């Protein structure tokens, strides 16, 4: 399970040793960092599976084959430098897929991993607020044209973003397929897609909406 981390730490050590003075000390820091990331990722995974967002999740013998591929993909995200919050979301997705009896469809996890692993905190905040707004609209039964954007934009402004920053952030998030741009209201706006609600059932996105 930790081979990717081992290889990544070794590569970092080789690069540092080649190009930087005081390399032996710095190489040790690189190795220690890789080991720290491995431990953190393992703790996050165990925490989410044992007592996380979906409660306790028990894996069965028939889960072994898909789980090997899924954990390998999770570990690749660790090796690629995914932040703690992103790794927690990925672990929640794994637990959610098991809970929803979708674990055998490994493509599902690969899709969500590709979306979540490198999102920034700002982008995650946009997703959290977007999901909360969609659920508020659904619960109120008041879905009208452009209602989603008319709620999302001021919510992000209240969080401290300028209109230009909001446009850039939403454009960035739209690459994931969770938001899509619309141009029928005089200016470019954004709308959530069904993927957002589906992801929200697997990972605690709404908790990210606080700022």
Regions found by a protein language model. Name each.
Residues 1-48:
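Membrane-inserting effector segments that mediate pore formation, membrane fusion
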Residues 1-2, 61-64, 99-102, 142:
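A short, ordered amphipathic alpha-helix with a cationic face
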Residues 7, 34, 59, 75-82, ...:
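Non-transmembrane, amphipathic alpha-helical segments
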Residues 7, 21, 25, 41, ...:
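Residue-level detector of well-ordered alpha-helical segments, enriched
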Residues 11, 25, 73, 111, ...:
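A general alpha-helix detector
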Residues 15-18, 52-56, 60, 74-85, ...:
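Short secondary-structure junctions and interdomain/linker hinges
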Residues 32-77:
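Amphipathic, membrane-active segments
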Residues 87-211:
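Long, helix-rich, hydrophobic modules that act as membrane-proximal anchors or helical bundle/coiled-coil regulators
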